[in-house]
Curated annotation (Swiss-Prot):
Signal peptide range: none
SUPFAM superfamilies: PLP-dependent transferases
Keywords of the record: Pyridoxal phosphate
Transmembrane stretches, start-end: none
GO molecular function per UniProt: cysteine desulfurase activity
InterPro entries, alphabetized: Aminotrans_V_dom, PyrdxlP-dep_Trfase, PyrdxlP-dep_Trfase_major, PyrdxlP-dep_Trfase_small
Protein name (record): Uncharacterized protein C11D3.10
Residues with PTM N6-(pyridoxal phosphate)lysine: 216
Length: 434
């Protein structure tokens, strides 16, 4: 079976979409619907616990296999550069709180960055770290020149998402890292909206670290994340991890005896727990094996094809998509329609369409389970709404985020359409002097 056939077969693994002509699921960027590859793996894990008196060694071995699969997907130079976390927030915070800095030093982020990145830095303000915000409203691509006016000799890090959750904007992480890493400035990337949906090469990106959750492009339940830390960056971080258990200690012995001169792993393994979320790692392993067989480049091309079809159909209805159409500057799977009238979200929900709503418009996002038929159905619903004379662009009176959708639920993005609190942060441009 070739890659395209495997992708098309994947829809049959998603029970939500089987025999269901009502639901049009276009909300991958919120969370992927459960698939049978993962649910079968989860049931297998439960059975191992039910009928095996000592399953833990097997689960630990599986964890290392999954770490290796992730290293292959990300093109990490070593699997030890990868550690498992609870989610993106934990992964980002582990790196943020490992950074060496002094009061008066600063970090630079976009003013509409995801809260998981933004508030992690903001929490360090009380200790003397300055957080500088780069205005990004109306901009749909960030590169090194975007950040340059805000960087100076006391800048310690730049934090950003590779793909912005509220616009589909794809930022040039590589350009940013190549410009600022040689100056001793770390680059911390949130890859949650990209991993599993388009190709990522962490060595080529040249980032210090990146983090992501596994419940979007990697098809897993919530509760599992990944942190990658470049082997080149480890020595530049604090010598002691933010929190420490036995898993962080390199020479931890089976006799479990404590010693005062503990030596921590000189890799991302220093952030590891003694016990991991083995059940979720089992689920991740199942999806990664499928994904690697299909090929991430094939996944990216398939999703881009759906995106091109969507844009073409929308243009025929005079409905625009915000941002660039060039995939160098836009994600492979996520598109925000410039539909500002909140009536549309309610109408789409009534028609069985699962999407997300932001201040900037309605977000449509694709997964491997989507086909061109979903686009045809969605466009039919849009035509129906237009025929009912529902205005497209009545701007809502206040900022909005992902709305309460009984078909979807509420995400941690619910506050993310609000800009980060500029009244407590520095957002003035500065002349770069390094």
């Amino acid at each position: 079976m070739n890659a395209l056939a495997k992708i098309k077969a994947f829809r049959s693994y998603v029970p939500l979409l089987q025999g269901n002509t009502k639901t049009i699921y276009l909300n991958q960027s919120f969370q992927a619907p459960m698939n049978m590859l993962v649910s079968t793996a989860l049931q297998g894990y439960i059975n191992e616990g039910l009928y095996n008196p000592h399953p833990k060694p097997m689960w630990k071995e599986r964890t290392e296999e999954t770490r290796s699969l992730l290293a292959k997907l990300l093109n990490a130079s070593t699997k030890d550069s990868i550690t498992f976390t609870r989610d993106t927030t934990e992964g980002l915070n582990l790196f943020q709180r490992s950074l060496k800095w002094k009061p008066g030093d600063n970090v630079v982020i976009l003013d509409n960055e995801h809260p998981n990145q933004g508030f992690g830095w903001i929490a360090l303000q009380n200790d003397g770290l300055e957080v500088r915000l780069v205005p990004n409203e109306g901009q749909y691509h960030a590169n090194a020149s975007t950040f340059a006016p805000y960087v100076d000799s006391r800048t310690k890090a730049i934090g950003l998402s590779s793909v912005m959750f509220h616009s589909g904007q794809k930022n040039d992480v590589k350009d940013i890292a190549n410009a600022f890493r040689p100056k001793g400035i770390h680059v911390l990337a949130d890859l949650t909206q990209q991993v599993g949906l388009s190709k990522i090469d962490v060595q080529d990106l040249n980032v210090s670290a990146c983090a992501f959750s596994c419940h979007k492009g990697l098809g897993c339940p919530t509760g599992l994340g990944v942190l990658y830390v470049s082997p080149l960056a480890i020595s530049e971080l604090r010598s002691t991890p933010p929190f420490v258990g036995g898993g962080a200690v390199e020479d931890f012995k089976e006799d479990l005896k404590l010693k005062l001169n503990a030596k921590y792993h000189q890799s991302a393994l220093r952030y590891e727990h003694t016990n991991n979320a083995y059940m979720l790692i089992t689920a991740l392993r199942a999806y990664l094996k499928f994904l690697l067989k299909v090929g991430i480049s094939n996944v990216e091309r398939y999703l881009q094809g759906l995106g091109k079809d969507l844009i073409k159909e929308l243009e025929s209805l005079n409905v625009s998509v915000i941002g660039y159409k060039d995939f160098d500057k836009h994600s492979s799977h996520s598109y925000v329609l410039k539909i500002l009238n909140p009536e549309w979200f309610d109408f789409l929900r009534q028609q069985g369409v699962c999407v997300s709503r932001f201040e900037s418009g309605i977000r449509v996002s694709f997964g491997l389970y989507n086909t061109s038929k979903d686009i045809i159905k969605f466009i039919s619903v849009i035509r129906k709404g237009l025929a009912l004379n529902i205005p497209l662009n009545i701007r809502p009176p206040q900022r909005i985020a992902v709305m309460d959708n009984p078909l979807v639920g509420i995400s941690d993005e619910a506050i993310a359409a609000m800009k980060l609190p500029a009244n407590t942060l520095s957002n003035r441009p500065l002349a770069a002097n390094i």
